[in-house]
Amino acid sequence: MREHYAETLKIFFSQKVSKYRNKLGVTQEEMADRLMMSCRSYSDLDNGVSCCGGLTLALFLTTICPEPAAFLEELKEAFDSCKVNTI
C-alpha cells in the first residue's frame, strides 16, 4: 500500500514542479539551483523518474509554491483517492 502513496506523490510532485517551472519561465538548471539539488536530480523529478525527498518538498513549499496550503490540500485529495483505489 505504501508503494501506491509513493507513486502518487512522485506523479503529483512531478506535475506540480514542472507546472511551476514553466509558470516562472525558468530552466531546469535554475529550478535545480532553487531547490539546492543537482540538475540531473531535478530532471528526474521534473520527468517523473524519481520522487522528492523531505528537504526538496520543504524547499519547494517555502520558496517556490505560491500557495502551500492549496498544494497540500490537493496532495491530500490525491492520497485520499489512492486509499479508495487500494481498498
Predicted features by range, described:
Residues 1-23:
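A short, Lys/Arg-rich alpha-helix, primarily the initiator
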Residues 2, 70-87:
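Short, charged recognition helix plus adjacent turn
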Residues 16, 27, 53-56:
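Residues that mark the N-terminal boundary/hinge immediately upstream of a DNA-recognition element
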Residues 25-43:
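Short alpha-helical DNA-recognition segment
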Residues 55-73:
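DNA major-groove recognition helix of helix-turn-helix/homeodomain DNA-binding modules
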